Amino acid sequence: DILPDKVAAWQYIEKTAREISAKYGFGEIRFPTFENIDLFQRGVGDTTDVVQKEMYTFVDRDGPSITLRPEGTAGVARAIIENGKCSDTMPLKYYYIISCFRHEKPQAGRSREFFQFGTEMFGSNSPASDATAI
């Protein structure tokens, strides 16, 4: 829970993240909270702890298994491919501020829903690009 007395601090952090990201040419991307489980099995690895033990996965009424996103990178990569952005001028630079979900053993200061700010850069393998993303 983020109660009213803490919301201003959260908004400040989010605003700062957005401003810095925009300054370095990153565009905000939004993508679904639920994704097909195959995305994470392929992207994260089907033998990883995240896929094997930590994801919330459900069978959709239409049949396929869907998962609450445990992280952001796989969803961004899927969005780029499905929306035909691979042929755009490189590098592609995106950022996101999202809720993620992991079925981890609850610990002090850690919950199963957490907030993640991330940057992703596709189409460049230079150390300078890595530094920009960081």
What does each model-identified segment do?
Residues 1-134:
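TRNA-recognition modules of translation machinery and tRNA-sensing kinases, especially anticodon-binding
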